[in-house]
Amino acid sequence: MGKDRQGRGIKKGRCVASDFSVMAGIASLFWHVLFPVACPICGRAGSTGCLGCIKGVLSPSGPVCIECLNCYPCDRHTLAFPHYFGATHKGPARQLIHLLKYGHHGALGISMGRALAACLSFPLPDALVPIPLHNESPRFFNQSEKIAQGLSLELGVPVMNCLSWNVRIHPRALTKSYARSKLPEGAFKLDECRLKAGIRTVMICDDVCTTGATILGAAKTLAKGGLQVLGSASFTLAKGKK
């Protein structure tokens, strides 16, 4: 340890430590400029969501009946199609949904869809049809479409945005399961100009399934347009009152 002109000790170690902290801060800032996103689970820079991390959040337990959300096949609803989901709507899975919807992380939805693909086990459809964004939604992207895009990458099945809302329903009106189960008849319309040639069978994609009413409403509209719905899928399942 040296001395200054007045004989006081000079602790060089503090200077070195301070310099190191400054350099570390600069390096961290530079890294985040290059990679401004990070996996919400492990924190890995440059990743919008590690596929392995998201798969670790999932806990699939087989399909449910889209009519009653009980085990599929269902004795009560023999004509119902299966609904597949990645996890129940709680814990880390719920947090990912909230980050996707309210954190404006569209790329995260694609990773979530890719992870969800491993939970599906029925014949591949000709196309994936996402539930459309509500007319009054303030979001810049459709979270259901992002999940469908991820599924498309893994399954090799195209996304077909052929549905739109036929009625103006404010998103806040659908936050309660009771309201979801009371969707008006003809809530959706089929945009025939967006139908792709050769498409006969489809799978409906959504971010969260609460009562199944939204998916069932979409399925009725698709069926009227001559499309067969093989099943549906959502990242999470939040059972609500039918």
Feature locations, PLM:
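Glycine-rich phosphate/pyrophosphate-handling loop used in enzymes and phosphotransfer proteins
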Residues: M1-K242
